[in-house]
Amino acid sequence: MSQLQTLRGMVDLLPEQTRRWQAVESVAREHFRCAGLDEIRTPLLEFTDLFARGIGEGTDVVGKEMYTFLDRGDRSCTLRPEGTASVVRAALQHGLLSQGAQRLWYGGPMFRYERPQAGRQRQFHQIGVEFLGASSPRSDAEVIALAWDLLTDLGIQGLNLEINSLGTPDDRQRFRSELVQWLEERVEQLDAESQARLTTNPLRILDSKDKGTQQLLNDAPTLLKALSKESVDRFEQVCALLTALQIPYQLNPRLVRGLDYYGHTAFEITSDQLGAQATVCGGGRYDGLIQQLGGPVTPAIGWALGMERLLLVISAAAQADPDGAAARLTATPSPLVYVINRGEQAEPQALSLARQWRGAGLAVELDGSSASFGKQFKRADRSGAPWAVVLGDEEASAGQVRLKPLRGEGEEKQLTWEDALSYLMKQR
């Protein structure tokens, strides 16, 4: 019988990795709490029409990458490929927008059928932020600052913010016509994928990874030059606010996002921590999406970061700076106390002691092997705990434990349970 394995692009998170994820999520939660954001959780499975209407049928995500199937009711369903459309659907369905502007965050798995590679799987995880009902340039700057500060606190070095304006729908339509005309005159110089996009989603050609196409685009028209005065003024306000916040940025007139709902501010944050520039966060403004999904005209802006890519960057940062914030996030936590126990009386008492001390807030690991004291001491040392509590039948009869330091200097103490607990509470 063949060994059961995960599907390609689906990855198990083992305990060591899960601890790192939890550490990152904990930092993110605290940032969001301080910024007044509320968490929202949406289903993994949605009607396909949500993403076809929201993301855009001409996008690679909808056209090539979604996990879509007919359920037993003959309804087309899709595993969510991103979080924004689902958050907007939930806000509309439950009337959140009638309560005023919403500052929301989400986290969880997404699914796209694409080639698996380091930091990019078919089931991947995102943490995202959505400000619904936020119209001012200040909101753009605040959202970007929230991402920048979170990544900085995670200990990531070499951050680079690239920003662009995609303008209004009229701006983009005007630019699209100019770009298509320019590219059609040079269509034979485009790579095959870009040639296909010329008729379906020409703005995505600006994001081509083909080196020949990239070189050709150096002379192409840019969207920034096609913006209306109002769009230019708005973008300049966003840039001025970022400067005031001392967040460095670079203008990237080729920056477009892969989803059709973006307009005005678009941005990506990359890091050179992996050697090459790797995108760790991306987002932008999507003022037309809520109306497109059946709601009122509502401005909105948000971002998402990919956890798999982020954890690769954090691991690289930890190696580069063993004393930095990233290293602390990736460190394996150790118990404060390792309980070594053996004997007919001692073993049930050890279980009771561990339970009591855990209830007091101590991290206590209990050896449940009944192995020799020598073998248990070796396991205690490997656990990383600074203290071992030894409980044999002799100690059990006396209502005491032996408290032995496992790290550094110190003498073994024989104490009652209560005195040992009081002593350890002071050592935390």
From Swiss-Prot:
Return the Pfam families for the record. Answer: HGTP_anticodon, tRNA-synt_His
- Where in the cell does this protein reside? Cytoplasm
Query: What GO biological process terms are annotated to this protein in UniProt?
Result: histidyl-tRNA aminoacylation
What EC designation does it have? 6.1.1.21
Which GO molecular function terms does the record list? ATP binding; histidine-tRNA ligase activity
Swiss-Prot/TrEMBL keywords: Aminoacyl-tRNA synthetase, ATP-binding, Cytoplasm, Ligase, Nucleotide-binding, Protein biosynthesis
Top class in the EC scheme? ligase
Q: What is its main location?
A: cytoplasm
Matching entries from PROSITE patterns are given as: AA_TRNA_LIGASE_II
Reactions it catalyzes = tRNA(His) + L-histidine + ATP = L-histidyl-tRNA(His) + AMP + diphosphate + H(+)
Q: How does it assemble?
A: Homodimer.
Protein name, please? Histidine--tRNA ligase
Look up and give the organism this protein is from: Synechococcus sp. (strain CC9311)
In the record, what lineage is assigned to the organism producing the protein?
A: Bacteria, Bacillati, Cyanobacteriota, Cyanophyceae, Synechococcales
Q: Which gene encodes it?
A: hisS
